[in-house]
Amino acid sequence: MDKTLKLYNSITRTIDIFTPRKGNEVKMYICGPTVYDSSHIGHARTYVMFDVIRRVLSDYLKYNVRFVMNITDIDDKIIARANETGASMEEVTRKYTEEFFEDMKTLNVRSPSFVTFVTSYVDKIVKFIEKLEANGLAYESRGSVYFDLNSYQQRYSYPLFKSKDGINSEGDENKDKRSPCDFVLWKRSKENEPRYESKWGHGRPGWHIECSVMSSDILGEDLDIHAGGVDLAFPHHENEIAQCQAYFMQEPWVKCFLHTGHLNISGLKMSKSLKNFTTIKEALKTISPRQLRVLFLHHQWNKDMNYEKEHLKFAETIEKKIFNFMSVAESMRKNALAFETLENADREVLRELGNVQEAVHAALLDNVDTPAVMKRIVEMINFTNARIKTISPSTVLVVKDYIKEITDVLGLSEEERQESPGEDLIAQLLSNFRESIREMARRKEPYSKFLEKCDWIRESIKDYGYIIEDNSEGSILRKK
């Protein structure tokens, strides 16, 4: 099978052929959250879509992926939140770290191979900065340490994801810098801020240095893939590249940089600073985790995406189509025979399946084109459904098993439990139905009464979003 994967590389601004540096091993790093608040659906999109890319690499293309994520648990925003709430920094970061991973589990995002916390890496961060200083690429000023961009540019290529003005102040005091574009590696501590010892005095790590140190500690001096949201491209990712190339004295540090596009609401980027964000938990009150993933899959991962109400309904419709088909197909398994005569309709469906398999494979290799994959999957379901009464159960199951293979790669779990407020009522309804049937059997009531009761349960369960369908193979339960 051709494994020539092409990915949009933010460094080259082109779709490049991806080949790991070392055999079958892929070293992949993603910037995790700064844990001072609840994650929003913009974050959800980033982590879900990189979960999909990771699954394509590991499950579909069979690469051995080492996937590292950091947690930023020292930051100005965390300090501000602790001061606002009266909680300690540890209480703030613990709360939102736990909430983040709960959200990721709900969204069926696989756990990283390794998770790193900044607070556990301060000593290594200090040593990393000391080497940059020794290499002549960092300098101390009034207890803080800055990256010397002018010195760096004389040796290495920079910038890569340049902003409009190229200035990276990040709120630092320019009077302490040699150049306004220099960025902080070590911040001197102010009163009532967390502080760690260093040869420059008490301070704490700057934002960018954290990821450089943690990624290289786990994955070594170079990466195959670095991933994150496009809002981190400048200055964060650009500065990461500069730090690592200066430290290891080689380039390129990252082979392929991947950035998800912005998630927009009413044409505006969703962000906490604009106060137009919807948390993941709030979003999941109106759409299931699987439906949210379906919605994301219908948009190319590296393009901007609009989040609109009508899109939620579309995702719900597509999700039900896929998993209702899987449910109906699975109900046929008991009647599928290993040796069946193929009719023309069976051959037609299997021929179309072959075309779809080729198209899906090509789409996955072409920058992980999930919209094209979803389109072909739905078309295959429609094609099969139109002939389902004239083809054998075995043919239906061949289609179903392939669709399950691909939906598994996309992270659409067939076993996802769809919780709803009516679940307890459904359980009570079925309990009452069972008790009624037992009582009717004890009274030896006529056969027609049992059929009436079966019709009653079929009508009653519709109120909770389920349909019981009878066919020649028996009865199946599916969602409306």
Swiss-Prot record:
Residue ranges of the motif 'KMSKS' region: 269-273
Cofactor: Zn(2+)
InterPro entries, sorted: Cys-tRNA-ligase, Cys-tRNA/MSH_ligase, Rossmann-like_a/b/a_fold, tRNA-synt_1_cat_dom, tRNAsynth_Ia_anticodon-bd
Reactions catalysed: tRNA(Cys) + L-cysteine + ATP = L-cysteinyl-tRNA(Cys) + AMP + diphosphate
Gene Ontology MF terms: ATP binding; cysteine-tRNA ligase activity; metal ion binding
Gene Ontology cellular-component annotations: cytoplasm
Residues spanned by motif 'HIGH' region: 33-43
GO biological process: cysteinyl-tRNA aminoacylation
Binding site for Zn(2+): 31, 211, 236, 240
Record keywords, A-Z: Aminoacyl-tRNA synthetase, ATP-binding, Ligase, Metal-binding, Nucleotide-binding, Protein biosynthesis, Zinc
Cofactor info, note text: Binds 1 zinc ion per subunit.
Annotated ATP binding sites: 272
Enzyme Commission (EC) number: 6.1.1.16
Listed PANTHER family: CYSTEINE--TRNA LIGASE, MITOCHONDRIAL-RELATED, CYSTEINYL-TRNA SYNTHETASE
Similarity section: Belongs to the class-I aminoacyl-tRNA synthetase family.
Name of the molecule in the record: Cysteine--tRNA ligase
